[in-house]
Every structure is written in structure tokens, then in C-alpha cells.
């Protein structure tokens, strides 16, 4: 499972290193291929291919004319691109995805159990602040209580 937050740089060619701990999890549990796609929060999601294929199969079973499904397919599936790691553990992030997430020089990788988020440093700081403000909401507290009982 992916966990932790890691700050990295992105070079002029759009490459960034996948943090070693995330790479070890990826290689140990999956393989070295990631699917990058746009996320609804103006970041990118990096899925191991196996997790992505499971998501696609679940979506394929749904009615594509259902509004939520159609929107997810347009925003999530249509933007997805396979991005293998190079021999140095770097990922080339396509220009359209870099632009969408505002990735320029400093990026933040965030392990989110089965998916990895890739943020601009500024976007991550804003998302963290929003999460802190929501942390005491009844919904968050309910989920936390359920997790502790499991």
C-alpha cells in the first residue's frame, strides 16, 4: 500500500523521480508501470496498471449514458496515459497532464493506499489546509470510528 508524502523536483523535460519508498511498493506489489490521469482535485492520480484495469472494468459494467459515469470517463479515462519508469526510476509526465495539475518545478507525491497523487507544491499545501478544516466534520469522524472498529 502506498503511504507518505515526498517532495521532488521536475526537470525541464517533464521528468520526476518516483520516490524510492513508493517505487519499492510499486515494484514489489505490481510492476513498474503507472497510469497517470487527471484527478478531480487538480492533481494527477498515478495508478498501478492492475489497479487501473480493475477500475476500468468496473466502469465498463456501468451504463455509459449515466451522467456521473460519462463525466468520469471524459475526465478520468480519456486523460489516462501509461507512463513507465525509466532505468533511473523517473517518470515522464506528458505536457497535457503537467499543465492540468500546474506541475512546474517542485512536486509532491502523496501515497493514498492504492493510488498515488502527484501535486504541485502549492496545490498540495492548499489541499492540506482544506483537509485540516474538514478533519473535524461528522463525516470524517464517522469514517475514522468505523476504521478503528474494523
Curated annotation (Swiss-Prot):
UniProt keyword annotations, A-Z: Cytoplasm, DNA-binding, Repeat, Transcription, Transcription regulation
A biological process term (GO) from this entry: negative regulation of DNA-templated transcription initiation
Single GO molecular function: transcription cis-regulatory region binding
Protein localization: Cytoplasm, Nucleoid
Coiled coil segments of this chain: none
InterPro entries assigned: MraZ, MraZ_C, MraZ_dom, MraZ_N, MraZ_sf, SpoVT-AbrB_dom, SpoVT-AbrB_sf
GO cellular component, one term: cytoplasm
CDD domains for this protein: MraZ_C (cd16321), MraZ_N (cd16320)
Residue intervals of the SpoVT-AbrB domain: 5-51, 80-123
Highest rank taxon of the organism: Bacteria
Pfam family, one: MraZ
Subunit structure: Forms oligomers.
PANTHER family in the record: TRANSCRIPTIONAL REGULATOR MRAZ
Family: Belongs to the MraZ family.
Name the record gives this protein: Transcriptional regulator MraZ
Amino acid at each position: 500500500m502506498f503511504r507518505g508524502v515526498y517532495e521532488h523536483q521536475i526537470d525541464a523535460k517533464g521528468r520526476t523521480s518516483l520516490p524510492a519508498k513508493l517505487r519499492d511498493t510499486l515494484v514489489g506489489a505490481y510492476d513498474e508501470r503507472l497510469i497517470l490521469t487527471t484527478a478531480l482535485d487538480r492533481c494527477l492520480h498515478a495508478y498501478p496498471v492492475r489497479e487501473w484495469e480493475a477500475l476500468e472494468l468496473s466502469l465498463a459494467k456501468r451504463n455509459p449514458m449515466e451522467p456521473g459515469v460519462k463525466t468520469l470517463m471524459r475526465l478520468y479515462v480519456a486523460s489516462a496515459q501509461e507512463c513507465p519508469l525509466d532505468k533511473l526510476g523517473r517518470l515522464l509526465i506528458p505536457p497535457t497532464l503537467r499543465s492540468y495539475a500546474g506541475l512546474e518545478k517542485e512536486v509532491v507525491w502523496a501515497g493514498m493506499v492504492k493510488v498515488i497523487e502527484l501535486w504541485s507544491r502549492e496545490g498540495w499545501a492548499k489541499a492540506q489546509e482544506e483537509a485540516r478544516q474538514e478533519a473535524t466534520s461528522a463525516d470524517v469522524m464517522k469514517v475514522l470510528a468505523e476504521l478503528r472498529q474494523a
